Amino acid sequence: SYTPGSTFKIVTSISALQNIGSDVYSRKWQCDKVYDVDGIEEDNIICNARHGKVDFETALAKSCNITFSQIAIEIGPEKLANTVESLGLTSSVTVSGQINSAKGKFYLKAGDPDATTGWTGIGQGQTLVCPAAMLRLMCAIANDGKAVPFNVVDRFENQAGKTIKFTRDTKETQLLSSDIASQMKDLMRNNVKTQYGDNKYKGLNLCAKSGTAQIDNVDAHNTAWFVGFMDDDENPYAFVVVAEKGNSGSQTAGPMAKKVLQAIVNGTY
């Protein structure tokens, strides 16, 4: 499991839609690059740019730390934790009914200070997410809120080479409402149209979010994420790319995703 960086803003967005509702679209937040949460300089939340006044959709596309830290604080630790739990991000993912992934970690709890809540809401701090759980969430957003089980194993064999019977899991799990899934699909599509560039991902009809998790103060040590799916009935594929020591999500993990997805669409994989 890895620090999710700004991919966690997908989770904070879902929680905002669940707890604040549609009013979140009509509001604006002021980003002056630095947010003084509590008067303690070390707790200041820093943004990647001075965005000025931004709405919800623009804040996600520009990955505004100030906006999403303030949204997380407004939602509160308990409700944000409930969203994380309901999306399955602290649970292991079972593959082919037999293999369990690592579990995620989410430590935010009632009574935690605003600074901790704010940093958590933008995917920094102690939160850890397993790529398999993030992939399951991407599948759910693309699939009307329903997550499908993962089956990647054709068969199991014992030491004698005999096939062991196992039952494939086919049960879908409703992780979020179809309405919120649809809204998240639109928001993630807007990320690509307005920020990453449809021209860079031509023909993919991509819905995505990048993330750059800062492990220390060295960019080369960052964990780079690029997550999402193709909104395409002929190529209904979700993806998660995680690059350890990857510098930047959009610059490192994004091109990796593009190469694989284009190979799928072009039939050259």
Where are each of the predicted segments found?
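Beta-lactam-recognizing serine transpeptidase/beta-lactamase-like catalytic domain environment
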Residues: 1-5, 11-245
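Short, gly/Ser/Thr-rich active-site loops of penicillin-recognizing serine hydrolases
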Residues: 163-164, 168, 256-269
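Short, charged, low-complexity patches
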Residues: 134, 249-258
